[in-house]
């Protein structure tokens, strides 16, 4: 993938920072969008700018600016997300809108911008493995993420004439700052480990590897799919 041009939105998060490092290792050209925290990067990039991922206008403007910086955008990866684990009757209307906006609206904004601005490109969105199973207290996050999985199927059809591919990656529990409330809690971590037949939680590199596979132009016959990278969480039953 040497010299391919990739946009990464959410580049300063746990998965985003790993993906950016991995793409740099294979000599890709990077155009990075971040929210509050500027990515800590010590290698050259084409563009780095703040993006309000819950704003259609901000996403459209950022992707358009990136397009104008390079001869062709080979892929866009959208990584914004959140974890809110509560029974529905404890979730406020404000929390509901926050989760929907950060997860589903941000992904829709990327699909919207890609459909208008790009051709012959791979778009990868982030969902969660738990949309495939019924875990207690996950109603809010699966409501947002399941919409992303349906969206990649529809968008793959809508924009097939532009040679745009849309896929989603659904991680299990991954060791990132976003999941600290689980991974740093010994009891919660023990329970989570028992749900993954691989007997470990994921690392950002596990997710980065799948994203790199999907944005690689060599794999351009893959579209409209959700890939669960979850250590068996969604597909196996542990003793």
Language model: regions and residue ranges:
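A conserved structural motif in NAD(P)-dependent oxidoreductases
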Residues: 196-207
